[in-house]
Structures are given as C-alpha cells and as structure tokens.
C-alpha cells in the first residue's frame, strides 16, 4: 500500500504507532519511493472514495512577482531547487521559464513545478542525488498535481528525514 501524497512523516509515525488505521482511497495517487506500508503493519483499513482535499494555488501579488523575478535572476542554470508554498515561491517558479537543467530536491511538491517539469526546464540532469528524478516528501496542490504524480516514475517521494538531511542536500550542485 502507498501513502500517496505524504511520504514526509507518515512512515515514521506508522513505525512508532501501536495502532495504524489506513484509509484506502482510489483518488490517492500512486507514488514511488518511501511512500509505502505493508498491509501486515495495519491494525485496520477503511475504504473511502472521496476526492482529495486541494490546496488552492496562492496567486502572487504584484510585489510577490517583483520579488520572484529578482530571485529567479539569482538562480543559475543547473541549480537544484528547494521550493516552498505561497505567493513568492509561485512567483519564483513562474519566472524560471527560460532557465535550463534545473533540479528538484524539495520537501513540498506544488502545482508551480509541474509546468517547469513538463517544459523540460526542470530535468534533474545536473543533480547528484537521484539524478534524473524529481524528489519530494509531500504534495500540496490541486487535482492536476495529484494526476501528475500518479504512477509517475520520474517522481520519488521520500521520508522528510531523508529529503531534508543537510549532508544529502549538499551533494547537489547550487542548491537554492
């Protein structure tokens, strides 16, 4: 079974818990990486078929767009991105369309990275940790993001302790 959008703390929490109850939902995207729990670890499972909660994309303000543009100018081609959630991170992502060979090694996967991945701006060709793969610990976004994730072998979901390990992060070039 897969955790889907939350490889961040789910595995660690399940490992420490005395009781583990899972929701089985066909709307949860199948994800590769650490987002996995064996059925033998479950105390119980409940089937639900409800759409996932969606996080509306924060629309950048005019000031956010200016800040995002300035930040994007500082990001060199071949950099590895760690991106956050909100107006300024979305403005930065929107301003990166002319960049080349960016990598993604981030805790939070958001809607803003999908166009950059699909256009080839984010290709992970310069990364040293999981080269060629997008890396995240959790996904926060829309149905479009969840559809992008589903059975996507180019996206690896890892436990947050692994993803955010500073010794691992520093292996990548030009982390921003």
Locations of the language-model features?
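Conserved phosphate- and dinucleotide-binding cores of soluble alpha/beta proteins
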Residues: 1-176
């Amino acid at each position: 079974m897969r955790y889907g959008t939350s490889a961040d703390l789910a595995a660690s929490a399940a490992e420490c818990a005395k009781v583990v109850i899972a929701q089985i939902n066909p709307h949860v995207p199948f994800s590769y990486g650490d987002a996995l729990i064996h059925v033998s670890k479950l105390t119980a499972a409940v089937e639900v078929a409800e759409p996932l909660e969606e996080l509306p994309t924060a629309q950048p303000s005019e000031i956010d767009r200016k800040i995002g543009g300035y930040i994007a100018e500082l990001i060199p081609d071949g950099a590895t991105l760690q991106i956050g959630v909100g107006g300024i991170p979305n403005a930065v992502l929107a301003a990166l369309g002319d960049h080349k060979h960016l990598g993604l090694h981030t805790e939070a996967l958001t809607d803003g990275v999908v166009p950059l991945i699909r256009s080839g701006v984010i290709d992970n060709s310069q990364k040293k940790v999981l080269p060629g793969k997008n890396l995240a610990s959790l996904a926060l976004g829309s149905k479009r993001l969840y559809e992008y994730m589903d059975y996507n072998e180019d996206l690896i979901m890892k436990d947050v302790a692994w993803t955010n390990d500073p010794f691992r992060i520093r292996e990548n070039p030009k982390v921003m």
